[in-house]
Amino acid sequence: MFAYLKKKESGIPTEELRITVPKVKTAENSALSLDRTAKLYIGGKQTRPDSGYSLNVVNADGSLAGEIAHGNRKDIRNAVEAAHKACGWQSSTPHLRAQILYFLAENLETRGEEFQNRIMKLTGVSKKQAGHEVETAVRSIFSYAALADKHEGLIHQPPMRGLALALNEPIGVLGLVCSDEAPLLGMLSMLLPAIAMGNTVVLVPSRPFALVATDFYQVLETSDVPSGVINIVSGDAEELCSVL
């Protein structure tokens, strides 16, 4: 009578079923494994090269470090035009330039480990040597920030009656080409005195160490450096210099 209440055998074992789920690679540290082509830095923003091509950069051990944008004649022209448009930097107060350089040094210092690792891989130097270069680079920015508002003019007394004023004025737009030594410090040693005195620059980084310059883009973007003051065009240095 109550047969319908009895538990029917379903034919499926009552033991716990175990389902094997394949392991899926998570996105942890995916940003480090992404292969991206670095852009140029013109007019305060990252831009694609006119040619659409890129160049490989290798580490000291021969492995591929990444790619850099292959700038050409048009990119240099755009960078020079952007530098001329940033003429307000020349008339800015030395105090303002000093404050921006201080901020630049602080932002570079917070990313010191990142630059240290990059220098180690590109040059093959020890961790201590790479760290020393980063520390020296940060101190250099602080030093030029302190000097920015101390480069004052002079008052001369000529042989004739009266006074003569000697004023320090920026040159204007400077073209800078980095050497193949000291990836970070070498670049900043050319860049800092130029912008501290009110000049705008178009910089061509060293091809073997150009990734240090492209990493520097993010430091510039977070340091309130006005658009067009610093323009960086990577590529074949000989080709770019002939245009610059």
Language-model-detected regions and their locations in the chain:
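Alpha-helix N-cap/helix-start motif
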Residues: D50, I76, G112, A130, ...
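Short acidic (Asp/Glu) and glycine-rich catalytic loops that position anionic groups and cofactors
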Residues: N56-S63, Q116-I119, A196-M197, S223
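Rossmann-like NAD(P) dinucleotide-binding subdomain of oxidoreductase/dehydrogenase enzymes
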Residues: M120, K150-L244
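A generic structural motif
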Residues: Y53-S54, A69-N72, P208
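Hydrophobic face of amphipathic alpha-helices that form TPR/SEL1-like repeat modules
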Residues: F2-L64
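Short, surface-exposed helix-loop/turn micro-motifs enriched in polar/charged residues
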Residues: P49, T93-L96, Q129, G186, ...
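Glycine-rich loop-to-alpha-helix module at the N-terminal edge of alpha/beta enzyme cores
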Residues: D61-K150
